[in-house]
C-alpha cells in the first residue's frame, strides 16, 4: 500500500527523521532523540507537522443549527468570532465517531479540524447528516486528498511550548494580532509570504502555543523559518508522551465508535442538560456512565504501562487504554478505564508479563504547563 504524505514529507526526510506508517500516512516519529524533542516542548518550543489532520469548512445560513444536532457539545457556546470548542461527534448509539475542534467565524461560516484516520469517514457522515436534515450546508474538505478541484488545500503546523508564541511572532510579524488571543480562540491574518493564516491558540501537549493553518503551498517556508528561529522539529513519539502527560485522549486508542464519551473521561464535552437534541443524546442519557477514566502511576519497578494491560482492583478488572514512560516525571504513567468504586489514591495491580505490579490511581492530567500535578 502506498502511504499518503504531507507537503512537508521531503523536509522530514532531509532532516533525517525516522518515518513510520501512522494510519496510512508516512509520518516522522522522531528526528533523533524523542526525549530531547519532548523536553524542548516542555521547556522551550517545538513544532509538529499535523497536516495529516483535515480541515473541513462549513458554510450556509443553517450551519449553526446543523452543528447543534451533529455535535455532542453545544455550539451555542460559540458567540465570538474565532472562538473554538472541543467536541465529540457521535453515532446514534452514543459511540464516538471522532473528537474534533469546531471554530466559529460567522453565523454562516464554521470550520472543523478532524483526525487524520477518521477524516474520510467523518466527511461521509457529515454529508449524510446534512442530506438527512435538509440543512443545505456547503461542506468543503481542505486536505489535499479530499479537497474539491480548484479549492486550495491547507496544511497545519503545531508550535508548542512556553516560548512558542513569542517565536511565531518574531518570525512572522503578521501574526501579532494573535497576541490578545485567549486559549481556544483563533484569528485569521494575511501574511505576505504565507498568504491567509489561521492562528489558533490550541494544542495537544499541555503547553501554550499555536496551531497554524496555512496554504499547503506555503507550509515549507513556514517550517523552515520557524526552525531557523530555534523551534525544534518534533515527531509523533514526543507528541504521544506529551499528550499523555497532559491527560489528552487519542482517538482509536482511548475511545472509538464502541466507547461512550462518558466512559472516556469526556463527560465535560457532552451537553445533556439543554433541551437541544443531538445524534447519540438519547443513547447516552439511557446508558449513563458505566466506567471511570483515570490515571495510573506505576510504583513497582520492572515494567512500563502499556495499552491493553489488565488492571486488577477490588471493584473488578479494568484496562489500560494508553501508557508510556513519562520523560517529565521519570515514571511510567497510563490512562485506564476502571470500574465504579475505584477511588483516586487507591493502589491497584497491573498485569505486566505475568507479573502483578502496584500502581496508584490518580486524577488526570499528570503535567500541565511544565508543572507536575501528581507525585
Swiss-Prot record:
**GO MF annotation list:** aminomethyltransferase activity; transaminase activity
Identify this protein by name: Aminomethyltransferase
**Alphabetized InterPro entries for the sequence:** GCS_T, GCS_T_bac, GCST_C, GCV_T_N, GcvT/YgfZ/DmdA, GcvT/YgfZ_C, TrmE/GcvT_dom1
User: Which HAMAP family does the UniProt record give?
Assistant: GcvT
Please report which protein family the annotation says this sequence is part of: Belongs to the GcvT family.
| Role according to the record | The glycine cleavage system catalyzes the degradation of glycine.
Q: Name one GO cellular component term.
A: glycine cleavage complex
Query: What UniProt keywords apply to this chain's record, in alphabetical order?
Result: Aminotransferase, Transferase
Q: What sort of enzyme, by top EC class, is this?
A: transferase
Q: How does it assemble?
A: The glycine cleavage system is composed of four proteins: P, T, L and H.
| Reactions performed catalytically | N(6)-[(R)-S(8)-aminomethyldihydrolipoyl]-L-lysyl-[protein] + (6S)-5,6,7,8-tetrahydrofolate = N(6)-[(R)-dihydrolipoyl]-L-lysyl-[protein] + (6R)-5,10-methylene-5,6,7,8-tetrahydrofolate + NH4(+)
Q: Which organism is it from?
A: Cupriavidus taiwanensis (strain DSM 17343 / BCRC 17206 / CCUG 44338 / CIP 107171 / LMG 19424 / R1) (Ralstonia taiwanensis (strain LMG 19424))
Biological process GO terms, please? Answer: glycine decarboxylation via glycine cleavage system
Which EC numbers characterise this protein's activity in its record? 2.1.2.10
